[in-house]
């Protein structure tokens, strides 16, 4: 007869991209794929499901914490941009300001929110910021299954424009389209994620430039599917826009608008699990060709205890 145990968690989200955060720094927690899937399931009455499950372990090197990341399908992945901001805010609430977060995709320096009581304040200085790893564009670093000298124009589907490929801690394909992005991720995301050129799969981003430094973005996350927002997707899209010259942006600042941002514009009064609360539902990315930083809102939803 198998034994059950309870495990404490905190439910958080970054622009609707939601997480179950388990702090295992004092009491070790090792979850199998089936347990991850159970906690992430949308019909789980305790957690309400999640896109990613984040387990915090003692650091492996010189950081403050090691963040283990699982997608809803039980697969372990290297990076999660929104999740990193959530963990930065979580640790700041416990007294660790500007924590250093280790991940499989690299070590992240953070700038924790100045006011943890108001993570959704209108002043972006109060929102967690993450200094991301240097983007990698070499075909072996992404990685791609075939050697390609130019990874900025990779054909993944005959009906779509070429993709800009980049690794920002995890692999991404960014496809710019002229008109709106609505429906494209749902239509093509799963097929492109499994493309033969992508031995480890990839997150798939459909982007459209809609303003001087504004990019509309829809993302299909590897192992999670459609997502309300993707932090690493926002970073990958800013990198692509910079190198492809999509935006004449002398400040190297990009405002990335995920689906929830468009929903907010349509309904200013909307408030779902603390996602908006009056702040801009955008991810702000700064990229100068080398250094990459992303900043955006996160929210605490509730604390709970699940039985495994």
Where on the chain are the PLM-derived regions?
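A glycine-rich beta-to-alpha transition motif near the start of alpha/beta enzyme domains, typified by
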Residues: 1-125, 174-308
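C-terminal domain-closing interface element
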Residues: 138, 145-151, 156-158, 166, ...
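N-terminal, positively charged, Ser/Thr/Ala/Gly-biased leader segments
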Residues: 1-28, 130, 142-166
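Selected transmembrane alpha-helices and immediately adjacent juxtamembrane segments
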Residues: 163, 171-174
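A generic alpha-helix propensity feature with a strong bias for hydrophobic helices
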Residues: 136-138, 146, 152, 174, ...
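Membrane helix-loop-helix hairpins that form the core translocation module of multi-pass transporters
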Residues: 127-135
């Amino acid at each position: 007869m198998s034994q059950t145990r309870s495990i404490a968690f905190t439910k958080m989200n970054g622009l609707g991209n939601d997480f179950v955060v388990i702090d295992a720094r004092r009491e070790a927690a090792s979850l199998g794929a089936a347990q991850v899937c159970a906690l992430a399931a949308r019909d789980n009455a305790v957690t309400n499901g999640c896109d990613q499950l984040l387990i915090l372990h003692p650091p492996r090197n010189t950081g403050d914490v090691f963040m283990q990341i699982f997608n809803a399908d039980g697969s372990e992945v290297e990076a999660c941009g929104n999740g990193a901001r959530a963990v930065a805010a979580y640790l700041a609430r416990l007294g660790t300001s500007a924590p250093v977060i280790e991940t499989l995709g690299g070590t992240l320096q953070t700038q924790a929110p100045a006011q943890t009581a108001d993570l959704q304040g209108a002043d972006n200085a109060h929102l967690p910021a993450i200094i991301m790893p240097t983007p990698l564009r070499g075909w072996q670093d992404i990685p791609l299954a075939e050697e390609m000298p130019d990874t900025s124009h990779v054909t993944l589907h005959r009906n779509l424009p070429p993709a800009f490929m980049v690794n920002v801690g995890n692999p991404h394909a960014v496809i710019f389209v002229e008109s709106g992005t609505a429906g494209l991720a749902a239509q093509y995301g799963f097929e492109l994620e499994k493309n033969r050129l992508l031995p480890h799969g990839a997150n798939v981003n459909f982007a459209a430039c809609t303003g001087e430094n504004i990019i509309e973005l829809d993302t299909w996350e590897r192992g999670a599917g459609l997502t309300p927002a993707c932090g690493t997707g926002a970073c990958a899209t800013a990198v692509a826009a910079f190198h492809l010259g999509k935006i004449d942006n002398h400040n190297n600042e990009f405002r990335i608008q995920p689906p929830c941002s468009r929903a907010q514009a349509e309904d200013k009064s909307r408030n779902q699990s603390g996602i908006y609360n009056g702040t801009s539902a955008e991810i702000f990315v700064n990229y100068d060709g080398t250094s990459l930083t992303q900043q955006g809102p996160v929210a605490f939803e509730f604390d709970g205890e699940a039985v495994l």
